[in-house]
Amino acid sequence: MDIRLEHANICVHDIDRMIKFLRTAFPEFKIRYDGIGADGVRWVHVGTETTYIALEQVSIQPENKWIPYSGKPGVNHLAYEVENVDIVRENLNSAGYKDTTIPNNHPYRKRIYFNDPEGNDWEFVQYYSDKNNERNDYT
């Protein structure tokens, strides 16, 4: 059996702004569920039939804002494989999202990075090869 990430659950301040970000990056994403949990907190599943992001409304404000790559425990970014990173970049740039792409050149892949409205970093990668040894080359 192939292992895959079925979903990720992220607590956010503004669910609707996050939905807009995700649907800008992935126009095929749909709202799978939008409701209020037993604790009175809104949560939404946005994605496809096979993968999604669960967005949960923040109920407690953190002492410090999370900053990706700060060296503190937490998720630095989530990465999605896409067919064409240039289209994703164009869509996100047109919508005003912050491009955080670091210089990266590789013969077998192209990567871009963007911040969502919550300050989380997202990676989008396009592979130019179907060969695992080339896709997994980190030189």
Q: Over which residues does each language-model region extend?
A:
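Core segments of cupin and vicinal oxygen chelate
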Residues: 2, 9-52
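A short, local hydrophobic-aromatic micro-motif
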Residues: 6, 30-32, 76, 100
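Short, small-residue-rich loop/turn micro-motifs
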Residues: 50, 57-59
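Conserved beta-strand in the GNAT
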Residues: 54-56, 123
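Vicinal oxygen chelate
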Residues: 1, 4-14, 32, 44-47, 65-139, ...
